[in-house]
Amino acid sequence: MSEETNIGVKERFYEELTEGQRALFMFHVYYNHINKSLIEFYWWSAYFMAQSKKWAALKACFKYFNDESFLLLLENIEQELKQHNHPTTLENFTITRDELNQNKELHASFESLYAIFENIYPATIEKINIFIEKNLQDFIQIEK
């Protein structure tokens, strides 16, 4: 399967989800990549930001779940990455995980951002759980 075909399949899958399922999917994908370490938090954030559709969907996810803290974190991540001239498209994306350790200012900023992430993600997960419990019909279809 070609890269273009693979992207098309992914986009069709995503489009078939409900708004709630999309929000949960985006959270799951992002969280599972960034929660492993500071370096993964940095690299995956840069990679997502370089894909405008994914970055916008990620922001929409936290708006959907009314999670202002995580939305603010994303805005701060974006600001920091742009300040350090990180690409906003995959066309120019050559970012490596090593770059974080090579730039002391960037490293210090992302250490602070990662500390915020570690502090807020338990509340984010709890908020999402409560939201799903109260709006189950937006996430699953129960056959009678």
Feature locations, PLM:
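Extended, alpha-helix-rich binding/interface surfaces that flank or overlap catalytic cores
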Residues: 1-55, 61-144
